[in-house]
Structures are given as C-alpha cells and as structure tokens.
Amino acid sequence: MNTILLIGGTGFLGSHLLNVLLKNHEDIYVVEHKKKIKDVKELRVIRGGIKALNSGMINKIRPDVIYHCARPTVPKLRKAGRKIAAYKAEKLNSRLLNELKKSKVQPSLVFVSGSLMYGNSKEAHNEHSGLNPISFARQYFKGERPLVSACFRNDYPVQILRFPWILGDGSWFKWFYMEAMKKYRAIPSFGDMKNTMQFIDVHDAAELMRLYATKAPAPGIYNVFSDQSLRQEDFVKMLSKIFRLPVKNYEEIFTKQLEKEVQEAFASNIVLNTSYPDILDKYTFKSLHESLDSLK
C-alpha cells in the first residue's frame, strides 16, 4: 500500500482521482481548502489548503506520491481573475517545491496540465515540442512555471501530465455544452469547425494519473491521451445525434458575449503525440460515444 497526498481532491479531475485511489485501497491524505472533502473514514484530511503543507508535515506523512490537481480561481473577474489566480499559483507552487526540497522524503509530484500549453499546429505535439500557450493557458502557464522549470532543471522529481479535452459532467463540457443544451436547446459551434479536437474521458484521465505515477520511466513531461480525435464539425454532429438537438453558431446561443479565450480554445487545432507509447500499450479507453452517452 502506497501513502498518497492529494491536492485538489474536490475538483473535476481530482474528485475522480480520489475515487480511483480509494478503489485501490491506498493510504490517502487529502488537502482541504474551501470545499469540504467527502466524508469517508479511510481519508485523512489536512485543512488549510496547499499553504498548510511544509517540510515537517511531509516528513511526518512520508508520502510516496503527491498528486496535484489544484488551481486557484477567481471566476467573477474573468481574465483579470485568471491573472490574479496565476500569480497566486506561481507563489504557491514555488513554495510547495521549496518545502518538498527541504524534506527528507522528497516524494514524486504528479501535476495536471493541458494541451492548450502547446498552441495551434497542424502537426502533432510530442513531449519535446515547444510551448506556445493559447487561450486560458496564457495565464495558467505562469502558475505552472515553477514546476516546468523543475522538470527542465531536473532538480526535483516532478511529472507533468498534459491532457487533451477531458470529457465528463463538469468543467468545460458542462459550462459550454450541457448548460447551453439545457437552457437554449442547441449545441454551440465555434469558427469554421475544421479544427481537430482530441478527447479523453475523465475516468480514464484519473486512472492514468495513477498509472503514470507508477509506470512512467522517469520524472518529466508526458502527454496523456486516447486515439479519439475528431474535427469539431464531427464532434458537434455526434452531440446532435445523441442529444437530438440542432447545432448553431455560438453567437446565436449565448446572450452574453463570450471571452475571446473561449472562442480561441474551441477553435484551436491541437493534437497530442508521445515519445512514450509503451505506457499505454495495454490500457483500454472508454469510447467517445460511450462517454457522451453517459452524460445524457
């Protein structure tokens, strides 16, 4: 049994990861911030958020792995809020790394990132591709910078897992598709719809976080994705068939003007590739149709 420390266990991906860890009977410590951790007797809760973690606590807990799924948010301020959140994240992640480096244990740190960090390209991105953050990632990158730097300097065992569009009942799909379908009875489209989108089910993403923590050959950056990629036009057609609703340009649906970052993200052409295909050789992914059908 491994000892696990989970940061961000109430979020979209973090809550699914917590279920995976519980299913595998890990010894789990969970950091609680504003939102309450679910009441499960197997969990040990650390209150006070990421600021509560220090080298002394790490030495006491002696985790084998720390999973980091948290990101500060100030949603009411939109772009300005993301800039504030990125500044906070940079400070918090720098402090966390410093405390981990001071500890006697120095557990591996597994951090969640996304494919928007690579930016638009007709070519697939592998782990050695340069970063060109677009959309929301322009602000998020500042918060991730201490962890990316640690990877490149190789001065602490950090894994950064970059996922494509994570599909589930929450996050982007809930905000921009499910809520639009319920409220406006239509499916939004963005741009000319010729861009390729790549998907992974949230349950698979959570399972694979645990897999990479144990099977990845070394610290570093890993692109984690399934082979499920579609042009946006085919994605919205699939949604239209499953939910039996028409496809309309987003400007016909949303009464308030969406931020340009939203439009840029959904019209972006980003496909992941990997230099480490062996890690996923025996993994069976949930199909895109199955994922969408489960959200009806």
Identify the residue ranges that each predicted region occupies:
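N-terminal Rossmann NAD(P)H-binding glycine-rich loop of SDR-like oxidoreductase domains
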Residues: I4-N24
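NAD(P)H-binding glycine-rich loop region in Rossmannoid oxidoreductase-like domains
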Residues: L43-R95, E99
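Conserved Rossmann-fold NAD(P)-dependent oxidoreductase catalytic core, especially the SDR/UDP-sugar
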Residues: S94-F136
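Active-site Tyr-X1-5-Lys
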Residues: N132-Q159
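Substrate-positioning beta->alpha
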Residues: Q139, S171-M178, F190-A213, G220
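NAD(P)-dependent short-chain dehydrogenase/reductase
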Residues: S149-T196
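Mid/C-terminal beta-alpha module of Rossmann-like enzyme folds, strongest
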Residues: A206-V262
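C-terminal amphipathic/interface module of NAD(P)-dependent oxidoreductases
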Residues: P246-N249, V262-K296
